[in-house]
Design a protein with these regions (language model features):
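Structural signal for interior beta-strand "rungs" in well-ordered beta-sheet cores
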Residues: 1-98, 102-105
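Terminal amphipathic alpha-helical/low-complexity segments used for targeting or macromolecular assembly
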Residues: 100-117
Length: 117
């Protein structure tokens, strides 16, 4: 497992084997990161979120608290996963997804402050 510069981790986080984290990644309380996950620069994972094995999180993406990502799911750069969402398919860059199963709510986001919901 490798950690980039400025990596931040809170209490009770679990990190599986062979993961890679970019620069200034934030893992909030009780997040669980499965084996072989890749989290790119400036991504943020909310409290209690679960990334199953081999997930990919793009640069600047935000994963809301309590969200669950199925094995092998990719979340594109600057995408946002709503709190409690269950993501079973890849999320394109710049999209906001929510629900169970997660569905696209908004497209064309440039970052977290651009949500407007």
């Amino acid at each position: 497992t490798r950690f980039g510069e400025g990596f931040q981790v809170n209490a009770a986080v679990v990190i599986g084997a062979n993961c890679e984290f970019g620069r200034h990644v934030l893992l909030n309380r009780s997040a669980s990161i499965g084996h072989d996950a890749r989290v790119e620069d400036f991504a943020s994972l909310g409290p209690g979120c679960v990334l199953c094995g081999s997930c990919r999180i793009g640069a600047g993406a935000f994963i809301g608290g309590g969200a669950t990502l199925a094995p092998g799911v990719s979340v594109g750069a600057n995408a946002i996963v709503g709190a409690g969402a269950v993501v079973i398919r890849d999320v394109p860059p710049g999209c906001f997804v929510a629900g169970n199963p997660a569905r696209i709510v908004r497209e064309g986001l440039r970052g977290y402050n651009d949500v407007g919901v």
